[in-house]
């Protein structure tokens, strides 16, 4: 009897800055529908989701709450998992970026890329958006504010490690051009090519010293690994990747991922940063990254700051009561 074909599907890991709203829940439910369909078609499906638990925003939220960052993320991650379970989603793995095995591999990955010459130490000076955890140049701002979320930005200057993005840019462009299915829908591919890749990539900041809640850089512990090199690698650490060459049978079976299902607001990180990290690690790229649209409420994106948020668990309870 022939072995079932594998299908590895992931969602973006949810950021633990607060309770997820129904727009966040949309993604896990959509991924669950795909996973269930693939199982019905005879695939051996592995469905991974989880929580992204480091960063300055969480450090500040924990301070406001009067608890440690770990206590804060334990509470929020537990709430996210509770809601995902309430939605009866059939995930196989719920990874947390505070998991010991994930943190261990992130340290190894950072060191491997540093030893290879892809990461170097420098200084960052520019504008920083704390909610988005992103750096921007003055020219990238829109009306002096964050181009992604529209919130105010603050000047930032600090020592940091950087990843040489431009080293792999041509190779990524070639991959995108020869694999039309890689970025979907096509409008997202055009956006990435025209707005980021073709104009040229700047080197990427991959460490911070202005806050402490993160994975320390082993050989320079005043630095913590910056969000994307930590968060994105969950897709490989969660299935047993080892940067020293001792990856598990599960990793060798499942990677590359068949589908990364993500929101359109983080398509750049998954179709530029992530594949370049994988190239540097000599790993194959995911087969497809799909950037789904937002779930809108009223005249725009659902947002806690706009006060237009609906919560999946509350709506679910209303439906049960109304039966």
Regions found by a protein language model. Give the residues of each.
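Short low-complexity, flexible loop/linker segments enriched in glycine and/or proline
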Residues: 60-64, 108-109, 136-139
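Short, charge-patterned binding micro-sites
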Residues: 51-57
């Amino acid at each position: 009897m022939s072995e079932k074909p594998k299908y590895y599907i992931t969602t973006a890991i949810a950021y633990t800055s607060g309770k997820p709203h129904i727009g966040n829940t949309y993604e896990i439910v959509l991924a669950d529908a795909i996973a269930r369909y693939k199982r019905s078609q005879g695939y051996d499906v592995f469905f991974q989701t989880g929580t992204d638990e480091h960063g300055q925003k969480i450090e500040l939220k924990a301070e406001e709450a009067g608890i440690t960052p770990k206590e804060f993320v334990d509470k929020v991650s537990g709430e996210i998992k509770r809601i995902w379970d309430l939605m009866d989603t059939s995930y196989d793995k719920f990874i947390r970026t505070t998991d010991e095995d994930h943190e261990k591999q992130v340290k190894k990955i950072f060191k491997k890329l540093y030893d290879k010459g892809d990461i170097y130490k420098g200084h960052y000076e520019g504008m920083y958006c704390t909610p988005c955890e992103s750096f921007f140049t003055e020219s990238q701002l829109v009306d002096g504010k964050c181009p992604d979320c529209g919130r105010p930005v603050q000047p930032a200057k600090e020592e940091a490690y950087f990843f040489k993005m431009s080293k792999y840019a041509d190779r990524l462009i070639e991959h995108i051009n020869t694999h039309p299915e890689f970025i979907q829908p096509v409008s997202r591919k055009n956006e990435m090519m025209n707005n980021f890749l073709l104009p040229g990539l700047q080197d990427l900041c991959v460490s911070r010293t202005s806050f402490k809640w993160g994975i320390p850089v082993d050989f320079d512990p005043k630095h913590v690994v910056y969000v994307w090199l930590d968060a994105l690698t969950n897709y490989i650490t969660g299935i047993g990747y080892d940067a020293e060459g001792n990856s598990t049978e599960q990793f060798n079976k499942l990677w590359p991922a068949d589908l990364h299902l993500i929101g359109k607001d983080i398509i750049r990180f998954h179709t530029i940063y992530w594949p370049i990290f994988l190239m540097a690690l000599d790993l194959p790229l995911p087969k497809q990254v799909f950037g789904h649209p937002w779930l809108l409420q009223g005249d725009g994106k659902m947002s806690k700051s706009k006060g237009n948020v609906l919560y999946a668990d509350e709506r679910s309870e209303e439906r049960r009561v109304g039966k």
